[in-house]
């Protein structure tokens, strides 16, 4: 009998959500049943990421990153990285799991060696404003950092060189993402704009070059997240306007608008759409929003397939991994 049976890590689909109620919840994606709840003491959770080997999940919060075991029902974090001031807003992993990267409101992006017994960070990249988002280029050699001054930094990990661009002065960059083919980079900001660049270079010693492709006036309110689909054909943007919009990357036209706006005239806003993640086949998308719910949608029709209900406060981040390791 498999000792992992019944644990989150043994499920081919990992769906986790977290936010302001100090819990991380794990769900059966197809049924909407919550299978496990972990108490994340004394802190909201700003970002979640599953390790490449699907053995652990990282939860970034106030002054720490905590790693929870997916292959047991241990309620306590198995590793705790701390010693950072302020909120950690972003967390992710190198594709072979050797190191973790984070960004935070202390204006620093950090690299943490996961193989080291010493739980200190190995490298720091300092910028001049609080960091909202960090994303690792698919080449695994450049970190893209977005900050509250409106700057996007490209930190070359091989040479320690960096470049920056400012698509809109003094407008906070809230999310950056590169599609799996490394053809496009997208960034969204607090004015609701989505900027898209074509990517060239980024191989060998070449730093990635960004060629402006388009600017989409995606939302009339603050845009919070952008994500490309695994097949690179779609781009999703989430916003404070209660919508997640799906754009075709062939021409960046709007394909579907997923809305949590109420049809009742008397009902006020259900809150912000904070985060999203596509399924591996790019047919479905999960969203997290401040009405305490996560939802599974059909990308093509915009139909809600499942609601994940249980959080007591806003759901601001999620991790969705339905790729089965070979």
UniProtKB/Swiss-Prot annotation:
> Can you say where in the cell this protein is located?
Lysosome membrane; Cytoplasm
Q: Which UniProt keywords apply?
A: Cytoplasm, Lysosome, Membrane, Repeat, WD repeat
Q: What GO cellular component is one of the record's annotations?
A: TORC1 complex
Instruction: State the SMART domains in the record.
Output: WD40 (SM00320)
**Please, which domain of life does this record's source organism belong to?**
Eukaryota
Q: Name one Pfam family in it.
A: WD40
The keyword Membrane appears for this protein: yes
Q: What is its main location?
A: membrane
Q: Where are the WD repeats?
A: 1-37, 40-80, 83-122, 126-165, 168-207, 218-257, 268-309
Q: Which GO terms describe its biological process?
A: TORC2 signaling
Query: What does this gene product do?
Result: Subunit of both mTORC1 and mTORC2, which regulates cell growth and survival in response to nutrient and hormonal signals. mTORC1 is activated in response to growth factors or amino acids. In response to nutrients, mTORC1 is recruited to the lysosome membrane and promotes protein, lipid and nucleotide synthesis by phosphorylating several substrates, such as ribosomal protein S6 kinase (RPS6KB1 and RPS6KB2) and EIF4EBP1 (4E-BP1).
Q: Tell me which PANTHER family the record gives.
A: G BETA-LIKE PROTEIN GBL (PTHR19842), TARGET OF RAPAMYCIN COMPLEX SUBUNIT LST8 (PTHR19842:SF0)
Spell out the family assignment given in the record's similarity comment: Belongs to the WD repeat LST8 family.
What is the annotated quaternary arrangement, including any partners?
A: Part of the mechanistic target of rapamycin complex 1 (mTORC1) which contains MTOR, MLST8 and RPTOR. Component of the mechanistic target of rapamycin complex 2 (mTORC2), consisting in two heterotretramers composed of MTOR, MLST8, RICTOR and MAPKAP1/SIN1.
Q: Give the protein name, as stated in the record.
A: Target of rapamycin complex subunit lst8
Query: What organism is the protein native to?
Result: Xenopus tropicalis
According to the entry, what is the taxonomic lineage of the organism?
A: Eukaryota, Metazoa, Chordata, Craniata, Vertebrata
């Amino acid at each position: 009998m498999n000792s992992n049976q019944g644990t989150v890590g043994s499920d081919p689909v990992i769906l986790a959500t977290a936010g302001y109620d100090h819990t991380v919840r794990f769900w059966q994606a197809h049924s909407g049943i919550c299978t496990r709840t972990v108490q994340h003491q004394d802190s909201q959770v700003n970002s979640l990421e599953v390790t490449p080997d699907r053995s652990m999940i990282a939860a970034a919060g106030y002054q720490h990153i905590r790693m929870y075991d997916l292959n047991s029902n241990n309620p306590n974090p198995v590793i705790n990285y701390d010693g950072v001031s302020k909120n950690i807003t972003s967390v992710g992993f190198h594709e072979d799991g050797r190191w973790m990267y984070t960004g935070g409101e202390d204006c620093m992006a950090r690299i943490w060696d996961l193989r080291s017994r010493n739980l200190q960070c190995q490298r720091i990249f300092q910028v001049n404003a609080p960091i909202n988002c960090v994303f690792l280029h698919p080449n695994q050699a450049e970190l893209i950092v977005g900050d509250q001054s409106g700057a996007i930094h490209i930190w070359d990990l091989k040479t320690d060189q960096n470049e920056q661009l400012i698509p809109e002065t003094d407008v906070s960059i809230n999310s950056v993402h590169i599609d799996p083919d490394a053809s496009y980079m997208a960034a969204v900001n607090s004015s609701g704009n989505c900027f898209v660049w074509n990517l060239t270079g980024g191989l060998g010693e070449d730093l990635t070059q960004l060629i402006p492709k388009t600017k989409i006036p995606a939302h009339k309110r603050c845009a919070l997240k952008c994500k490309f689909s695994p097949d690179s054909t779609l781009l999703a943007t989430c916003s404070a306007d209660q919508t997640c919009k799906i754009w075709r990357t062939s021409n960046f036209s709007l394909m579907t608008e997923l809305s949590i706006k109420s049809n009742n005239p008397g009902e006020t806003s259900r809150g912000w759409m904070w985060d999203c993640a596509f399924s591996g086949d790019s047919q479905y998308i999960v969203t997290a929003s401040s009405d305490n719910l996560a939802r599974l949608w059909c990308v093509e029709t915009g139909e809600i397939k499942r609601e994940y209900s249980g959080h007591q406060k806003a759901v601001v981040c999620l991790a969705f991994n339905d790729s089965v390791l070979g």
